[in-house]
Amino acid sequence: MKALKLVALTALLASAAACGGSDSTTSTSPSVTVGPTTVLFEGTVDPRGFAFYSFQVQQTGNVNLMLASVSSSTAPGTTSNVTLGLSIGVPSGTDCTIQNAAPASAGLTSQLVVNMTPGLYCARVYDIGNLKSTVNFAVRIVHT
């Protein structure tokens, strides 16, 4: 019986030692890092026409618009050197109210960079009087 009490006492002391009191806690929650979002906006623009695309900015930062390509709608893949209007604004019914704009020809750099606060915005591509026929376009939008 003494041996059983000794084994029980040893087990109790060992478990008490393992419970050494640490008051610190370690969080295992993952941290969330929000990086830039890239969206491709593709469509067509008729002479004297426009197209727009709405998007949500999650945090204050730059919104970059790049008119990546413009091509003939009658001969897809044929690059057009025409200059179009490129703008950023806020959606308004079936259009986009322009806040900032720039003329742009297709290229691989941002033609319009605007610092924006969180909210709903839109990119608008439009004819500035140069189009003789409908064109296809692609705009890359990078934002936070």
Go through each PLM region and give its residues.
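Bacterial N-terminal signal peptides that target proteins for export
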Residues: 1-8
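C-terminal motif of bacterial Sec signal peptides marking the signal peptidase cleavage site
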Residues: 15-18
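Short, low-complexity, disordered segments immediately C-terminal to signal peptides
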Residues: 20-36
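Non-catalytic, beta-strand-enriched accessory regions in extracellular/secretory proteins
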Residues: 38-78, 85, 111
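Short beta-strand segments within Ig-like beta-sandwich modules, predominantly Fibronectin type-III
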Residues: 43, 99-106
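Edge beta-strands of jelly-roll/beta-sandwich modules across compartments, strongly enriched
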Residues: 51-53, 74-86, 124-143
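Noncatalytic modules at the cell exterior or secretory-pathway interfaces
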Residues: 61-63, 113-132
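Beta-sandwich interaction modules
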Residues: 103-116
